[in-house]
Amino acid sequence: MSLFDWFAANRQNSETQLQPQQEREIADGLWTKCKSCDALTYTKDLRNNQMVCKECGFHNRVGSRERVRQLIDEGTWTEISQNVAPTDPLKFRDKKAYSDRLKDYQEKTNLTDAVITGTGLIDGLPLALAVMDFGFMGGSMGSVVGEKICRLVEHGTAEGLPVVVVCASGGARMQEGMLSLMQMAKISGALERHRTKKLLYIPVLTNPTTGGVTASFAMLGDLILAEPKATIGFAGRRVIEQTLREKLPDDFQTSEYLLQHGFVDAIVPRTELKKTLAQMISLHQPFHPILPELQLAPHVEKEKVYEPIASTSTNDFYK
């Protein structure tokens, strides 16, 4: 027997021995490998922990509907503007027609676009909620995303509801050109009208939150929350380094870096997010049951409360 025949025979024996193992039925996706620490986790346990690795705390991405299930009390979610769907006004084509790309993502995600909006209860407290989905064209903000968020904010303003937006986006959608960019000002205007009614707005920045979303409604909150180690910024890291010709810090454009420099108010792990949001919304209620001492006495006029602040701009303050 030649050396070649010997190797061929042994290869056939090896394949025969491995065949029963290959035929063994193993549930697809039974285990999940952490992208950060490489730990293997039973997928069911990972989902029960809201897709957060128990070994290192790495936050895996979650879809918009899963995020709603994590935050909203069961049976209280009412989706709004679900029938608003994108079109292709510019007849845009890159490697594929924009209209075809939209159909592919709609079939893949079972979403009409990169955000879902609605109302519900969070620990019994009503709110208006928008959740962006990075799985739909990178969570890019097109005209429909802008319209749905704008409608949600306007609904919250009319109904006196706090608004929470969970951001996950690569920025404005290039396939819609200026129609995409104008959503930045459109949503910002709606949020300003919401603010004048003294209503609460909280954006939650997840990985990633970049581009035009960061440059508009993601940074306009009364309180700005972020998930741990989320990438948050406007331009990409390499673009900034090449423009400035400087090496950026390793933690640049992370939620921890932004917290250190005052751009976000708190970093909240996903497993604590629902409780934290409920506490913030509860404390903002005009009549909070556990803080009666903070309510104004009946004889105190609300306008009088601000007089000492106004007086600081007069010369009498310095006499």
UniProtKB/Swiss-Prot annotation:
GO terms assigned for molecular function: acetyl-CoA carboxylase activity; ATP binding; carboxyl- or carbamoyltransferase activity; zinc ion binding
Ranges in coiled-coil conformation: none
Cofactor field: Zn(2+)
Catalytic activity: N(6)-carboxybiotinyl-L-lysyl-[protein] + acetyl-CoA = N(6)-biotinyl-L-lysyl-[protein] + malonyl-CoA
GO biological process: fatty acid biosynthetic process; malonyl-CoA biosynthetic process
Domain CoA carboxyltransferase N-terminal: 30-299
Pathway(s) of this molecule: Lipid metabolism; malonyl-CoA biosynthesis; malonyl-CoA from acetyl-CoA: step 1/1
Enzyme Commission number: 2.1.3.15
Binding site for Zn(2+): 34, 37, 53, 56
Assembly behavior: Acetyl-CoA carboxylase is a heterohexamer composed of biotin carboxyl carrier protein (AccB), biotin carboxylase (AccC) and two subunits each of ACCase subunit alpha (AccA) and ACCase subunit beta (AccD).
Role played: Component of the acetyl coenzyme A carboxylase (ACC) complex. Biotin carboxylase (BC) catalyzes the carboxylation of biotin on its carrier protein (BCCP) and then the CO(2) group is transferred by the transcarboxylase to acetyl-CoA to form malonyl-CoA.
Name of the protein described by the UniProt record: Acetyl-coenzyme A carboxylase carboxyl transferase subunit beta
